[in-house]
Design a protein with these regions (language model features):
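Hydrophobic transmembrane alpha-helices and immediately adjacent juxtamembrane helices
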Residues: 1-136, 141-253
Length: 253
């Protein structure tokens, strides 16, 4: 394994994040904090507790997941698309660096930025709503797995996109609606039975449910099922990335 190449790409991506700190960290934290203030502090005070947890605290895991998913995709997709746009990716592909080393570097940097963002949002939420973490190891596990999985997904989008506007199509039109409908602001047990069943086809339900369980011991889906679905999506994303590099899809043309 070419550790020097991985480290060089990783440091380059992290340096880019530092140069765009307002966009990559401060803006998502402020926008999520507004959710905490409006839904948690203002409206949440008028809503009964959800399964023994205040509404403001209940929505924290879902809002963290919302930021985590969108930023993981955005970080990774732009990170790999920009070299495609400028043509420098061909220098990278012709260098003595294997495909999996490229993926480790880009996805590792995107996941690192997302984990940092998630932790900062949690720290911010602790000042606004009462927050407790019953299973910190599981919390970190879901945080890291989700960041890596959706960074891989973002990497795929960055390879697929042939224009800057396409980088935002899937996050805006698919990921964000799925997150809002995935139990971020409510428990799916509040829904009629038919819609509970329909919700189980939403992959974000498993992410939010498992992440919320790590905080309060409350889950819409068994935590092991949530973990299994997360790992399955991770494996699927890895398989697609492997196929992309084997076939040269959108890389050799």
């Amino acid at each position: 394994m070419n550790v020097y190449a991985i480290r060089a790409i990783y440091h380059f991506e992290m340096a880019r994040a530092r140069r765009t700190l307002m966009q990559s960290l401060i803006a998502p934290v402020i926008s999520t904090a507004l959710y905490f203030v409006v839904f948690g502090a203002a409206i949440g005070g008028r809503i009964p507790h959800v399964e023994g947890v205040s509404y403001g605290a209940f929505i924290v895991p879902g809002l963290v997941m919302l930021s985590l998913l969108t930023q993981s995709i955005s970080n990774a997709s732009f990170g790999i698309y920009f070299p495609k746009f400028t043509g420098t990716i061909y220098e990278l592909l012709s260098a003595p660096v294997s495909y999996y080393e490229i993926v480790i570097a880009y996805v590792g940097a995107a996941a690192t930025k997302s984990v940092i963002l998630g932790l900062v949002i949690l720290a911010t939420a602790a000042f606004i709503v009462p927050l407790r973490i019953e299973h910190p190891v599981w919390m970190v596990l879901f945080l890291v797995l989700t960041s890596v999985t959706f960074s891989l997904f973002g990497f795929i989008i960055g390879i697929w996109a042939d224009g800057f506007e396409k980088l935002q199509i899937i996050p805006l039109l698919i990921v964000t609606p799925l997150t809002f409908l995935g139990g971020s602001f409510y428990s799916i047990n509040m829904l009629p039975p038919v819609w509970q069943t329909v919700s189980l086809f939403n992959p974000v339900v498993y992410l939010v449910s498992g992440f919320r369980w790590s905080f309060y011991g409350l889950a819409d889906v068994d935590v092991w099922v949530s973990l299994g679905m997360t790992c399955a999506f991770l494996a699927g994303s890895m398989a697609v990335v492997a196929w992309i590099f084997r076939s040269g899809y959108r890389l050799k043309t």
